[in-house]
Curated annotation (Swiss-Prot):
Protein name as catalogued: SrfA-induced gene J protein
Residues annotated as glycosylated: N114, N157, N172
UniProt feature, compositional bias: Basic and acidic residues: 17-29
Gene: sigJ
GO cellular component terms, A-Z: membrane
Induction: Induced by srfA, during development. Down-regulated by phagocytic stimuli. Up-regulated by Legionella pneumophila infection. Rapidly up-regulated by hyperosmotic stress, which is dependent on dstC. Shows early transcriptional response to sorbitol exposure.
Length: 357
């Protein structure tokens, strides 16, 4: 019987380790997504900085040509052309993107920690209840423990398979979400880069053309420069709105997937509780027959030795009473009540967790 009890404890220990493994894999996936996003953002900023620097250097060269044509009002024109109007907008865009990434990281960590705590807490409570049930059966010396152990071992294997499948599903979904975000970010980045190139190339051409007759068109140059700066600012604002909307959409998908995974896990736990209840119901039925027989034999023996002169009806009543009492005692062992309490605790925790997701 000691070997059976040890095996029951080992099986539940493996379930607890499985929950810890799920937590480690979730953290690895989260770190991978965060690091890749930061690398992409860094590359995007580097490319934009290089494009801006190169384009504005060309415009500055055009400004030198302007100085050869006019002397009056040159400081105003020079300031208008050589100041980088998009620099502040790019800094704002970088700040907003970094803030958005930090918020997504905090929210994702909270969801993953809640799921991890649910798995770990459920495994520990189930382990405690199983050890209690196993000890009760071991103390009674019931041979039925062998059958219960076989069913429990099969149940533990099925639970581990379900956990592995759910882990694979979450991992695949995480990879898919990251790929979608990366593809969408690359598309938006290419749009910004292409639009920036068009704006700065236009500035270069316009600057060279207007430099030849700047004496007449000084105000026009200033207006065109302001217009190009406004175009770039609007494009940056539109890009940030698209990124923000896409991030919110992906966060909603992640929450939905987390909720579905939680429901599937809770259903699997409920299924295992149902199997245990069925096994213990059979055990109670058999105990009822055994204790009923004990009551019947005990009643017959007692009436033969203690009440030899009693009437047949009195003897029959006494024997039937002991048999009924024994049967009732056997049928109402508290196994399923223990299982029900454990299930209700796990279900209540699941509902609390769903409110936090």
């Amino acid at each position: 019987m000691g070997r059976v009890e040890d095996q029951i404890k080992d099986n539940y220990n493996s379930l607890s380790h499985e929950g810890e493994r799920l937590n480690r894999e979730a953290k690895i996936e989260s770190e991978k997504l965060k690091n890749n996003a930061k690398l992409d953002a860094k590359d995007m900023k580097k490319d934009i900085d290089e494009s801006v620097h190169s384009s504005w250097e060309t415009v500055k060269e055009g400004a030198k040509t302007v100085q050869d044509y006019i002397s009056s009002g040159i400081e105003s024109v020079k300031h208008t052309i050589t100041t980088e109007p998009a620099q502040k907008d790019m800094e704002n865009l970088k700040h907003n993107v970094n803030h958005n990434l930090e918020e997504a990281e905090k929210e994702g960590s909270s969801v993953l920690n809640n799921i991890s705590n649910f798995f770990k807490g459920s495994a520990e409570e189930a382990k405690s209840e199983a050890e209690r049930i196993g000890y009760e059966a071991y103390k009674d010396g019931d041979q039925f423990v062998g059958d219960v152990h076989k069913n429990f071992k099969r149940t533990a294997n099925e639970t581990q398979k379900d956990a592995n499948r759910l882990t694979s599903d979450v991992k695949n979904e995480s990879n898919k979400i990251y790929k979608d975000i990366k593809d969408e970010s690359n598309k938006l980045y290419n749009d910004v880069k292409g639009e920036s190139s068009k704006i700065y190339n236009g500035a270069k051409k316009e600057g060279s053309k207007l430099a030849t007759d700047l004496k007449k068109d000084t105000q026009y140059v200033a207006d065109e420069t302001k217009k190009m700066a406004a175009d770039l600012k609007n494009k940056a604002a539109d890009t940030y709105q698209d990124l923000s909307h896409d991030a919110s959409k992906k966060a909603t998908q992640l929450k939905k997937k987390a909720s579905e995974t939680l429901d599937e896990s809770a259903d699997a736990i409920e299924h295992q509780f149902d199997i245990m209840k069925k096994d213990f119901r059979h055990l109670n039925q058999r105990n009822g027959m055994i204790w009923g027989s004990i009551g019947l034999i005990g009643g017959a023996t007692a009436t033969s030795y203690l009440f030899p002169s009693a009437s047949p009806m009195a003897k029959f009543t006494f024997i039937a009473g002991l048999a009924s009492l024994g049967g009732y005692y056997g049928l109402h062992q508290p196994h399923n009540k223990i299982v029900d309490n454990a299930f209700h605790k796990a279900n209540n925790k699941k509902e609390e967790l769903k409110k936090k997701i």
